Amino acid sequence: RLFQEIREKRGLAYSVYAYAQQFAGTGVLGFYAGCNPTKSVEVVEIIQEVLSDVVQNGLTVEEIDRAKGAVRGSLVLSQEDTGSRMSRIGKSEIVYGEIMSFDDILKSIARVTPDEVRAVASEFLIKSPTLAVVGPHKDLRKFEKVLRNGGSK
């Protein structure tokens, strides 16, 4: 949804993506947009608006199915690389205290429901965001205002 809104619909960024990293007891859910510095505040506003919409309205079944397919595809491709397989197995042991089989991971992905996505979104997407800005920005007050207002202008 972020890619569609920021890159495809508005043409404001060169690259837009989301990523997640899980660790024992904590993690990171991040969003990245590489854009012209003159558009960066607008891009942050749009990210906040999209995240707020996900919290309020959830994702469609189609969006969730697309995301599941992307995660499954990425996981399957990662199995071709020995280093990726070792990393997945080690991370599983450290984070979950057990090694989850490839099939169990695929089954877990398949079980994700719209209600679960919305619950996680409500818990994590708009509370206490942290923003890293790289570029020629001397005055960060506009960014701080966007974060305080949750994307609403």
Regions found by a protein language model. Name each.
Residues F3-Q56, V61-R111, K127-G135:
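M16 family metallopeptidases and their MPP-like homologs
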Residues V112-V120:
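A short, acidic, amphipathic alpha-helical segment used as a generic capping/interface helix at domain edges
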